[in-house]
Amino acid sequence: MASHKHPGSPGWTGPICQDMAGTTPKASAPRPDLPRPGPEDHLEAQGSPSSNSSMTTRELQEYWRAQKCCWKHVKLLFEIASARIEERKVSKFVMYQIVVIQTGSFDSNKAVLERRYSDFETLQKKLLKTFREEIEDVVFPKKHLIGNFTEEMISERKLALKEYLSVLYAIRCVRRSREFIDFLTRPELKEAFGCLRAGQYTKALDILMRVVPLQEKLTAHCPVLLVPALCAMLVCHRDLDRPAEAFAVGERALQCLQAREGHRYYAPLLDAMARLAYLLGKDFVSLQKRLEESQLRKPALRGFTLKELTVQEYLS
């Protein structure tokens, strides 16, 4: 696989949520923006509008009001709803069903996902590398050599894993880390983008519509992290001849890119939205104008289309 150690890829170890004005998409495969582990203050500062933003004072005020609203209300509750034993040719393991619900209001988009004990164990090892001091008092369920498939052990581990996730989520720098968000969303996102590359748009959409609400809740502190998945949904809807649905999800993506004109998805998204607007009889002139202004600020020898950009995500 080509290198993805650059801003905008999960392999990048520099600051996240920064202006991408100095980056140009390469043919190599960048993975989507994911948060770098670190203090919350740093993440919030990097999520600020860029210095070269063309937003008016009123737009900036509305931007910050929306951001504060997101930060204030998103709180998640974790449950291990069930467990099942899965047997394969050379292995046998327990799959735990995790249910994630937003508290404080009725959540019609509760997330349901499955992870095995080894996935939790991998998460713990990764977190220890970056947050050893922060999680030194967090109890991780021990591994047992025998008895892992007894009803008593599974019930005991379900409770322990629920407590483990809840305690991790209570630590701000951990819940906003790349490792924690990856644990809860990456397998599903990787599958969805694989379906997109294979032209299986209906299946890709089905997966994205289940995982994106969770990703949105986990990345409320930095909405730009949601952009690759939203753009993938746009591409799927568009290629399934659903221009209205594609345009609607594109508007969400543009909202996430407020004050982020230098982001690598900004120009390709505007181009796709202008074409959809023309097709739907909507105002496409203003979108074209924004695209032209963006291209003047950041000239590119060859611009990538939105589809060319999205199919490069989650290649490893």
From Swiss-Prot:
Record's keyword annotation contains Phosphoprotein: yes
Q: Entry's Gene3D superfamilies? A: Phox-like domain
Biased-composition ranges for Polar residues? 47-57
Transmembrane ranges? Answer: none
Q: Which residues carry this modification: Phosphoserine?
A: 3
InterPro entries attached here? PX_dom, PX_dom_sf, SNX20/SNX21, TPR-like_helical_dom_sf
Fetch the Pfam families from UniProt.
Answer: PX
Positions of the UniProt region annotated as Disordered? 1-57
Query: Which ranges of the sequence are coiled-coil?
Result: none
Q: Does the keyword Magnesium apply?
A: no
GO terms assigned for molecular function: phosphatidylinositol phosphate binding; phosphatidylinositol-3-phosphate binding; phosphatidylinositol-4,5-bisphosphate binding
GO BP annotations listed: protein transport
Q: What does this protein do?
A: May play a role in cellular vesicle trafficking. Has been proposed to function as a sorting protein that targets SELPLG into endosomes, but has no effect on SELPLG internalization from the cell surface, or on SELPLG-mediated cell-cell adhesion.
Q: How does it assemble?
A: Interacts with SELPLG. Interaction with SELPLG is controversial.
What protein does this entry describe?
A: Sorting nexin-20
